[in-house]
Amino acid sequence: SGGMMGIPSSSESIAPLVSAETARRIDNEEPFEWKIGGDVSVGKLVRQQFGDDVVDHVVSALLGGVYSCTADDLGLRATIPALAASLDKLAADGPVKLSDAVRAMEQARPRTPGKGAPFQTFRGGYAEVYEALAEKSGADIHLDSFISGVTRESEGFRVKGAPNEAGLYDRVLFATPAPTTARLLPALSPAASAVLKKVKLAGSVVVGFKFDSDTDPNGNRLPDNTGILVGTDQTDVHAKAFTLSSRKWPHLAERGGALVRASFGRFGDDALVRAEEDDLVDYALDDLQHITGFDGRAAGVSEIFTQRWFGGIPRYDETHLDTVAAAHAALADVPGIEATGAWSGGVGVPAVVADARG
């Protein structure tokens, strides 16, 4: 409990996960100079103030579940902007402590306990949303069209690869990954294209299971929590996280059995993303048993589903926000062209929707 994305205000909340020496270091943190408006990788900052244990055991595990990157690959302002703002505020009075910045955020949180499930979703999944949006938009949607570029003509934009009957378009919105957008833009904005080529992507793969029961024949049950995060220094475990879906989403438990999702892959290491499905299934079942004691094979596996995302999420490093600003500044000089996506507004549906509306 407490803290911010695994970064603690004291050793109390993470003491079982770090060494006694690290705990003392957290509680006796040395002040440091923070440049107002500056940026740094989350990993570098936390290692500097609290040591490697906190990054490798806690922070990278939490951030990796969201961004498919370690803390060392992620910029503070792009991923934890509120913490950067807290450091900025404290730095107005001189040297700062990371623990003080986190504590200030903890104290600013609403104290009213929430009611109901901490996670919410659509009973039929996000497919319900996509289908409703497609229907309400009234748009002509062309699936499986290979778009190779966009060019300007006297009366509008031509999208290369769109069906011939589509003709010219008054405006074009690119809602594609940054490298894809970069490849489509050279004829319209060489500057934006060059900037977006700098954005690197992380891949991931999930393996979903439906077990016949949440208890194996030896009485080992799946944990009652909603998920499991794995530290980056756990070399004997392949998975980076498990989502206990039937626990996290109560309506899924109504289907019977137990639904569990194993997640693999981090930035810079696509070996697991490209691994054979049979190997991924074995890794997931072995890791789950190693961590929880639950033997999924013995409990019975009735369904398996694998989904891969090659380059599914940007690396939000300490230069990312400047890259985004430069890309949008270049596109502002091209009337009729807009770009959005996770590279622009941040990870997650709310962030992407907010950026698109902006």
Task: Name every feature range the model reports, one short phrase each.
Residues 52-59, 193-197, 294-303:
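Short, surface-exposed acidic
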Residues 2-4, 8, 12, 225, ...:
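Conserved flavin/dinucleotide-binding core of flavoenzymes
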Residues 1, 53-57, 201, 218-222, ...:
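A short alpha-helix-loop-beta-strand transition element characteristic
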Residues 47, 130-135, 182, 186-189, ...:
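Generic solvent-exposed, charged/amphipathic alpha-helical segments
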Residues 145-261, 265-273, 278, 290-291, ...:
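Mid-domain catalytic core of redox enzymes
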Residues 141-143, 174, 339:
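A structural signal for the hydrophobic beta-strands that form the central parallel beta-sheet
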Residues 22-149, 168:
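Active-site/ligand-binding neighborhood in enzyme catalytic cores
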